[in-house]
Amino acid sequence: MVKLVFARHGESEWNKANLFTGWADVDLSEKGTQQAIDAGKLIKEAGIEFDLAFTSVLKRAIKTTNLALEAADQLWVPVEKSWRLNERHYGGLTGLNKAEAAAEFGDEQVHIWRRSYDTLPPEMAKDHEHSAHTDRRYAHLDDSVIPDAENLKVTLERALPFWEDKIAPALKDGKNVFVGAHGNSIRALVKHIKQLSDDEIMDVEIPNFPPLVFELDENLNIVKEYYLEA
């Protein structure tokens, strides 16, 4: 039996301000920093020992991963970063206050953009200050694969190869894995792991804290699923 632990990053400065974040590289808030540390303490108390860890290339997830592993006294655990674990790209909504977006586009439209499985938000302009096309961390990627907007369906399509190439093989090899990522990239992987329908995943929320644990058998069937508690 192996353990897969998902930790959504702690509260970010833009979470706190109620802004659409997506691929914008926003830092943790003071509360978010503490949530990451507390996540690590829960992991230590639960006696979970990791063999490797994965995170995105966005600082809020990277810092959460490092802080949690440090608090769990496992900072030595190898960490691999991948853009495939990034948050869903919110396109032209990035940086907008969610309440202001609702006032501008209407509550129903914004709700559809946020919660529909396969409806895309407006695309981000190539010259937007948060465009990934000019960001050095994505320079190794073909420009055609860098998104300008994503829904959960596209987020899953982007994250799934990383699951199949990196995470799943490690679990099948008997390794315990920590994944420090984002609300929607985790939701996408949870949809795959639990084989949820497009409608079922819409009701799934991943909190900033505490971490979510899956205990899996050798075929990666779920034996147990739970959130860590103090």
Swiss-Prot record:
Query: Which SUPFAM superfamilies does the entry link to?
Result: Phosphoglycerate mutase-like (SSF53254)
Q: Name one GO biological process term.
A: gluconeogenesis
Associated pathway: Carbohydrate degradation; glycolysis; pyruvate from D-glyceraldehyde 3-phosphate: step 3/5
The residues that hold substrate are 8-15, 21-22, 60, 87-90, 98, 114-115, 183-184
Q: Which InterPro entries match?
A: His_Pase_superF_clade-1, His_PPase_superfam, Phosphogly_mut1
Which EC class does it fall in?
A: isomerase
What chemistry does it catalyse, as a reaction equation?
Answer: (2R)-2-phosphoglycerate = (2R)-3-phosphoglycerate
What UniProt keywords apply to this chain's record, in alphabetical order? Answer: Gluconeogenesis, Glycolysis, Isomerase
Question: What one GO molecular function would you report for this record?
Answer: phosphoglycerate mutase activity
Report if keyword Isomerase is assigned: yes
Task: Please give one Pfam family short name.
Answer: His_Phos_1
Q: So which domain of life are we looking at?
A: Bacteria
Site positions per UniProt: Transition state stabilizer = H182
Active site (UniProt): H9, E87
Enzyme Commission code: 5.4.2.11
Question: Family, per the entry?
Answer: Belongs to the phosphoglycerate mutase family. BPG-dependent PGAM subfamily.
Q: Which PANTHER family match?
A: PHOSPHOGLYCERATE MUTASE
- HAMAP family reported in the protein's UniProt record: PGAM_GpmA
Function, as annotated, reads:
Catalyzes the interconversion of 2-phosphoglycerate and 3-phosphoglycerate.
Name the UniProt record assigns to this protein: 2,3-bisphosphoglycerate-dependent phosphoglycerate mutase
The species this protein was found in: Streptococcus suis (strain 98HAH33)
